[in-house]
Curated annotation (Swiss-Prot):
It comes from Arabidopsis thaliana. This is Putative F-box/kelch-repeat protein At2g29820. Kelch repeats lie at residues 140-187, 189-233. InterPro entries: F-box-like_dom_sf, F-box/kelch-repeat_ARATH, F-box_dom, Kelch-typ_b-propeller, Kelch_1. Disulfide bonds: none annotated. Gene3D superfamilies: Kelch-type beta propeller. The lineage of its organism: Eukaryota, Viridiplantae, Streptophyta, Embryophyta, Tracheophyta. The keyword Repeat applies.
Length: 388
């Protein structure tokens, strides 16, 4: 049995425990006054409605959308997203793709405004192909390439609108790609590798405004794998860092320059295919189960080329193979299973602070069990954070 909080359609919003009868019992004793108040609300100018809604946490939007069609249009508009961004009211929402040993992958999302923290299942989105590259820009999530079966690599691209959990196809990439590296820099998405290494078409760039692809001519690094397969990637300091079996590579689109580190470099000391990584404040974070620096969370300082521990808190013994970390609005989020509780997924939220000497300290703000499968062993394919 899977225990979670599911998104339901209908007047009860996203709370399955809501009782419609309770709403009727608690209605205003003066229905005429209620009707008048609603009529006045519906007569507000659209711009005023937009500014009012912009100040309200997004967790209440399913309820607000029931007021009228005009309110629903405002909630799903690009203009509201821009207004919230200008006012500094954007909120992070974390998406996770979770499956188990015998059940298919499903999308879930987590809002920081929900207490206690809960995962919400999304049934309207397609799963992500094995080996697909995923990049987020604002409230959109771009899923590119992957494989169908063992050797049928694809160039397919879809975009997910996380405001209303809809999706559609975008123009295909010019080449099929499997386990490519990708990242957004300057509003454009660069996709690297995922196919046989050759200078002419190893890099493609997607213009999100015109929704078009262009091939970027680039001299491939000599020591990169010939098949162009990458195990993981991040964006840091305006560069796309990608890891393959031979080492780490960084591509800077502005100059079209490559930089490489071997498998024995300091950067790859903790960066390996089994680990999950995220970038917060231009620093690279990961989990180190060996605690070789005295702590399970370590951070890489690219300007100094050094790893240091994140201090100030204790964690349960994590399972590295089943742990994923993400940047959740500047906080470090860990989705993990722990030794002895492999059928549970915990969500640990850590607030970070840079102290004197440049050391990072953390405080655990939340440690919640957000998923349980009593029958199967759950696993987390990916975690991505969008902001809107």
């Amino acid at each position: 049995m899977v225990v979670l909080h599911e998104i339901l359609d209908g007047p009860n919003g996203d709370d399955p425990n809501n009782n419609p009868q309770e709403g009727e019992d608690n209605q205003n004793e003066n229905p005429q006054e209620e009707v008048e108040n609603l009529r006045n609300l519906l007569e507000l100018p659209e711009e005023l409605i937009e500014r009012l809604i912009a100040h309200i946490p997004r967790c209440y939007y399913p309820y607000i959308s029931l007021v009228s069609r005009d309110f629903r249009q405002v909630i799903t508009s690009d203009k509201l997203f821009r207004t919230r961004s200008l006012l500094g009211f954007n909120e992070p929402v974390l998406y996770a793709l979770i499956g188990s040993t015998q059940t298919p992958l499903s999308w879930f999302f987590l809002r920081w405004s929900n207490f206690p923290l809960e995962l919400h299942r999304i049934r309207s989105l397609p799963t992500v192909l094995l080996g697909a590259a995923v990049v987020t820009i604002g409230y959109k999530m771009y899923v590119m390439g992957g494989t169908i079966g063992l050797n049928h690599h694809v160039s397919t691209v879809i975009v997910i609108d996380c405001r209303n959990h809809t999706w559609n196809y975008l123009p295909d990439m010019k080449r099929a790609r499997y386990r490519a590296a990708a990242g957004e820099i300057g509003g454009r998405i660069y996709v690297i590798g995922g196919r046989k290494k050759q200078d002419a078409d190893w890099v493609e760039v997607f213009n999100a405004t015109t929704e078009s692809w262009e091939t970027v001519s680039s001299v491939c690094p000599n020591d990169a794998s010939a098949n162009g397969v990458f195990s993981t990637y991040v964006v840091m300091q305006g560069r796309i860092f990608a890891l393959d079996r031979w080492g780490c590579f960084a591509y800077k689109p502005v100059q079209g320059l490559w930089q490489s580190w071997g498998v024995a470099s300091e950067l790859t000391r903790f960066w390996h295919p089994l680990s999950s990584f995220t970038v917060i404040g231009e620093l690279l974070y990961t989990v180190d189960l060996t605690c070789s620096l005295g702590h399970p969370i370590v951070v890489y300082y690219p300007n100094e080329s050094v790893w240091r521990p994140v201090m100030g808190f204790h964690l349960p013994i994590l399972s590295q193979c089943w742990s994923k970390i993400a940047n959740f609005g500047g906080k470090l989020v860990i989705f993990c299973t722990c030794l002895g509780t492999f059928k549970h997924i915990l969500c640990i939220v850590i607030a970070l602070e840079a102290r004197q000497g440049g050391h990072i300290w953390g405080v655990v703000e939340s440690n919640s069990r957000v998923f349980r499968d009593d029958m199967m062993l759950p696993y987390i394919r990916l975690c991505q954070t969008v902001t809107f």
